[in-house]
């Protein structure tokens, strides 16, 4: 009897099962993509920047009333920047709140995404930090300016292609 090939094709390996939140968004006509769950099983949803506000407004209406964390990261020199939003359904007598993470992948040349400040006020300083460290512009933010670095700082220090000024100067050997 011939042995059957048990290795999945790249297409089969790339299929990600949609979670409950993704299914709810699909049923309500919101365009998005389900990504693989994280190490702790939290559902991750990818959305285009222009659809972030409608999708986040819907998530708020569906009960995701708490922005636990907003942040950003760099996928590497020449690659995209990512702005992410970790949301929870918080309520009375809830010991294990439902969680979802929304990610927006942005081009590093012009990383612009709408601010979610008007949905979750807790995004205020978190979006400012992402702007300060990565240069992601949060359109509609009421006070988008540097929060950690001096106002006259040049560049975005947490980008992987950032070179610190005067860091590589020659040092005297003693």
UniProtKB/Swiss-Prot annotation:
GO molecular function: NADH dehydrogenase (ubiquinone) activity; quinone binding
Keyword check for Metal-binding: no
Bilayer topology: Peripheral membrane protein
InterPro entries: NADH_DH_suC, NADH_quin_OxRdtase_su_C/D-like, NADH_UbQ_OxRdtase_30kDa_su, NADH_UbQ_OxRdtase_CS
EC number: 7.1.1.-
Assigned keywords, A-Z: Membrane, NAD, NADP, Plastoquinone, Quinone, Thylakoid, Translocase, Transport
Main location: membrane
A Pfam family it matches: Complex1_30kDa
Compartments in which it is found: Cellular thylakoid membrane
Entry annotated with the keyword Cytoplasm: no
Domain of life of the organism encoding this protein: Bacteria
GO biological process: photosynthesis, light reaction
Function: NDH-1 shuttles electrons from an unknown electron donor, via FMN and iron-sulfur (Fe-S) centers, to quinones in the respiratory and/or the photosynthetic chain. The immediate electron acceptor for the enzyme in this species is believed to be plastoquinone. Couples the redox reaction to proton translocation, and thus conserves the redox energy in a proton gradient. Cyanobacterial NDH-1 also plays a role in inorganic carbon-concentration.
Subunit and partners: NDH-1 can be composed of about 15 different subunits; different subcomplexes with different compositions have been identified which probably have different functions.
Family: Belongs to the complex I 30 kDa subunit family.
Protein name per its UniProtKB record: NAD(P)H-quinone oxidoreductase subunit J
Source species: Picosynechococcus sp. (strain ATCC 27264 / PCC 7002 / PR-6) (Agmenellum quadruplicatum)
Gene expressing this chain: ndhJ
